[in-house]
Amino acid sequence: MHNFRKLVIWTRSIDLVTRIYQLTNTFPSHERFGLISQMQRAAVSIPTNIAEGSAKTSNKDFARFLEISIGSSLELETELIITLNLKYIDSMIFEDIQNEIIKLQKMITVFKNKLE
């Protein structure tokens, strides 16, 4: 069992959640039940699954939850692309957050591979 609070992948994903909430607060109000909700849920799913997986007694089970976290990060990345296409964000913000997501995906993948 791992202490999720000490995992860099968890702390970085918590930072990403904060950033996504701040970003989506700038979106049009008509997106409240659309992209805003979807992006926030995808972002929250990343650290939540890391934390839940850390309680599992086997590394195989933990790795499965890390795969779910990676899937949520890919969902978030897709939604970020949509927000760029809709011009809710500019390309600089997009690139900055996308790079953050990609770094996190790589970190989670490396950690998962070490468990297996």
Cite the ranges covered by each PLM segment:
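Amphipathic alpha-helical assembly/interaction segments
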Residues: M1-E116
